[in-house]
Each structure stands twice: as C-alpha cells, then as structure tokens.
C-alpha cells in the first residue's frame, strides 16, 4: 500500500506539471478502480487531457471506455474520434478496433477499403487479431479480394499464435483453388492449428485419415461449410424476426398509450 501511495503522490505531482503520460497512468488507475477507489469523473478528465496532448494510449483507453459504455456513458462519436486519434499515431490495438468497427458497419458506415488500410497497419505491427481479420477480408470481400495478401496476413497471424489463421492457411493450400494445391503445407498448418486447440482443424485431419484421400476430405469440408452458412443465415433470420416482433410490440404500446392519453382517436 505504501508503494501505491508513493506512486500516486509522484503521479499527482507530475500531473500538476501537465505531464501527459502521468495523466494517462493516473487516469487509467482511477478508471480501473483496482488499487484505489474508482473515480470516473477524474479518470475522464485526466485521460482527455492526456489524449488532447497526443498520448495515443490515453486516446485509446478513453475511446474504448466510451465505446464499451460499461464504466463511462457510451458515446460512439467521441469513441470513434479518440480511436482515430490513437490509430493515426500508430497504436495497433486502436487500428484493429477501428478496422473491426468499419467492417461490421453497425456504429459507423461500412468501408472495406478503410478496413483493409487500418488492419494492414496493425498487422504490420504483428497484431494477430488484425492480421487474421485482414486475411478474411482479402479472402472473401470482392472489393479488396487478393489471395496473396490473404495468405500474407494469415501467415502473420499464424506466426503470432492465431490457430484460426493456421486453419485458414491449411484450407487454402488444401483446396488449391486460388493457389496450387500443396497437401504437405496444408497438413502442416492444419496440424499446427489442431495442436493449438482448433477443433475444426482436428476434425478435418480426422476426416482425411478416415477417408484416406484428400478429395473426400475436401468434399466433407465443403459440406460442413455449406451447413455452417445455412445455420448462420437461419440464426440471422431468427434474430431479425425477434427484432421485428419487438418493434411491432413497441409500436403497439405507443399507439395504446396515445389512445389512452386522447392523442389519437
């Protein structure tokens, strides 16, 4: 405890001198509320001061807090602004989150080219999550489709321990659709993914061994992929149905309330 009190005293002194890194550290400490009592107002003020002085870590921390809306009130516009500030200063986690937001297109308009740009910048810093998502986009999105970029991105992710990237590389070399089929390389990546706990890779290896040939394994893989897409589409349809049902119930309640208040005859 004495060590924490000493650290807080030092940070408070540095904050008085407008030290942006001290503002970031103290703001983050107040935001987390682990070693001291949480103070969201002080945390928000300190992180903002630090971010406006160009501290990429503070901009990311405050932006993420606004995005999540758990500790601070959600503020999407400010979250995106701060994450952009952090990402523009080269912070890979901010670049990844921005890329993911732009890819989902839920809180900001979807923009695949910007997605690829931010994810590439994060992947260049060996961020495995960004590299994996970049690989998926280059593999599936027509606007930026590029098999070589997909492989490059997946390899970065795989080299940094992403088993899904290893699995994707195994499938790419197994299919031999956009690159020459290479069963040795395919099995290398599939085994690597399976060793890292990827059940899809383990099932595919099992299918290859049971069927005794690659053609049957590929057919099995394609069937599984087709079934997965059917299930995904069905779940999406059910989700939309639930949302529409909720909307109808809400509209009905609003109409009933208006009628009760004499606003609608």
Residue spans for each PLM region:
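Eukaryotic tandem repeat interaction scaffolds
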Residues: 92-106, 112-142, 146-164
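TPR/TPR-like alpha-solenoid helical repeat scaffolds
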Residues: 168, 199-218
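Hydrophobic face of amphipathic alpha-helices that form TPR/SEL1-like repeat modules
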Residues: 25-32, 61-68, 97-104, 132-140, ...
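Structural signature of tandem alpha-helical TPR/SEL1-like repeats
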Residues: 2-10, 37-46, 73-82, 109-118, ...
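Short helix-capping/linker turns of helical repeat alpha-solenoids
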Residues: 3, 17-20, 32-34, 53-55, ...
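Non-Sec secretion/translocation targeting segments of pathogen effectors
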Residues: 263-265
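Alpha-helical linker/edge segments of TPR/alpha-solenoid repeat scaffolds
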Residues: 71, 107, 178, 209-229
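Canonical positions in the second alpha-helix
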Residues: 13-14, 49-50, 85-86, 121-122, ...
């Amino acid at each position: 405890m004495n060590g924490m009190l000493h650290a807080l005293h030092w940070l408070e002194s540095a904050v008085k001198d407008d030290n942006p890194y001290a503002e970031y550290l103290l703001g983050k400490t107040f935001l987390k509320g682990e070693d001291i009592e949480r103070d969201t107002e002080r945390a928000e003020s300190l992180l903002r001061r630090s971010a406006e002085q160009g501290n990429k870590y503070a901009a990311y921390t405050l932006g993420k807090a606004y995005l999540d809306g758990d500790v601070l009130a959600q503020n999407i516009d400010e979250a995106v602004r701060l994450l952009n500030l952090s990402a523009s200063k080269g912070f890979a986690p901010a670049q990844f989150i921005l890329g993911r937001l732009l890819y989902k297109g839920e809180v900001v308009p979807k923009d695949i080219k910007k997605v690829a740009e931010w994810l590439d910048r994060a992947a260049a810093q060996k961020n495995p999550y960004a590299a994996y998502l970049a690989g998926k986009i280059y593999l599936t999105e027509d606007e930026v489709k590029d098999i070589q970029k997909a492989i490059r991105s997946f390899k970065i992710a795989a080299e940094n321990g992403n088993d899904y990237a290893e699995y994707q590389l195994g499938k790419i070399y197994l299919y031999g659709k956009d690159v020459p089929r290479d069963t040795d390389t395919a099995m290398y990546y599939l085994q690597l993914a399976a060793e890292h706990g990827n059940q899809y890779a383990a099932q595919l290896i099992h299918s290859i061994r049971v069927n005794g040939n690659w053609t049957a394994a590929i057919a099995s893989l394609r069937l599984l992929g087709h079934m997965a897409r059917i299930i995904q589409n069905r779940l999406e349809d059910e989700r939309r149905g639930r949302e529409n049902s909720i909307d109808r119930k809400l509209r009905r309640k609003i109409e009933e309330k208006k009628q009760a208040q004499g606003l609608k005859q």
